[in-house]
């Protein structure tokens, strides 16, 4: 069984519990063991535009904690994965910045060495575990559910630093969904942003972005909508009703984490997957 240090980030363990619950249910069935380490802090991505050195120091500190235990890091939140990956990219190629950051880490007897890989949700499910291994665990295929996929911004952008899937035509979520019996289909707004990062300054615009995408999904007759990001999930699931008001629509789109749908196909109970915590009408697909 392969072991990874679980880097939970901030949003998943404080708000988006269903993501963590579903991860912890499906991964042991796929021979993955998550190791919980003490001392992790925020990934620092929200600070990037304010202070680069602080941003790198916080990210490097998190990586160093895992390196100390000789573990690679599994970061299921795409924003966290981007922050840690970008930090690793910079420190591995800029010796002076590496030294500067390590001077800060020395206060805690930590050192960034660059020995731990940073693994995303798509890296783990699609590339490391693989669709064949996932298929072996499927007990209740999803009966050709027509599903709209949402990648979000941080899984596929910026492409020049290397992201888990293609920035213009990502297909890894689709490949996984087909493996568990679902029927993912293309729609024009597939690559659009959820709007979540506009909440601080332009909350109405954030909800409009959310509403526009969900309205398209609903109008096109999709059975469900799937994502892998706790920030995006907050927009599409928890804020769906308010988002509908901005586009003059009553939105009733079931929104799932990819890990929840995988869990359902494995025959895991809805309670263990945290489906009772989803605020969108996920019960609508119960009879499909």
Residues of each region from the PLM?
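Iron-sulfur cluster-binding electron-transfer modules in prokaryotic oxidoreductases
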Residues: 1-288
């Amino acid at each position: 069984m392969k072991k990874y240090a679980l880097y939970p980030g901030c949003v998943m363990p404080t708000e988006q519990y269903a993501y963590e619950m579903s991860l912890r249910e499906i991964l042991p069935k796929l021979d993955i063991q998550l190791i919980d380490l003490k001392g992790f802090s925020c990934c620092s991505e929200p600070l990037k535009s304010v202070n680069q050195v602080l941003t790198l120091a916080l990210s490097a500190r998190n990586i160093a904690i895992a390196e100390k235990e000789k573990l690679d890091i599994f970061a299921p939140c795409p924003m966290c994965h981007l922050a840690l990956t970008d930090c690793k990219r910079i420190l591995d190629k800029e010796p002076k910045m590496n030294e500067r950051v390590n001077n800060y880490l020395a206060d805690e007897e930590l050192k960034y060495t660059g020995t731990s890989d940073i693994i995303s949700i798509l890296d783990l499910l699609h590339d490391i575990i693989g669709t064949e291994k996932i298929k072996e665990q499927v007990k209740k295929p999803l009966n050709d559910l027509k599903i709209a996929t949402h990648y979000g911004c941080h899984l596929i952008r910026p492409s020049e630093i290397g992201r888990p899937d293609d920035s213009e035509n990502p297909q890894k979520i689709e490949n996984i969904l087909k493996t568990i019996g679902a029927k993912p289909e293309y729609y024009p707004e597939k690559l659009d942003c959820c709007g979540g990062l506009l909440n601080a300054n332009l909350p109405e615009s954030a909800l409009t972005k959310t509403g526009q995408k969900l309205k398209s999904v609903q109008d096109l007759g999709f059975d469900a909508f799937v994502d892998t990001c706790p920030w995006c999930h907050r927009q599409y699931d928890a804020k769906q009703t308010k988002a509908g008001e901005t586009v003059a629509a009553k939105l009733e789109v079931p929104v799932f984490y990819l890990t929840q749908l995988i869990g359902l196909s494995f025959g895991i109970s809805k309670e263990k997957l945290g489906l009772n915590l989803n605020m969108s009408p996920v019960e609508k697909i119960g009879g499909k």
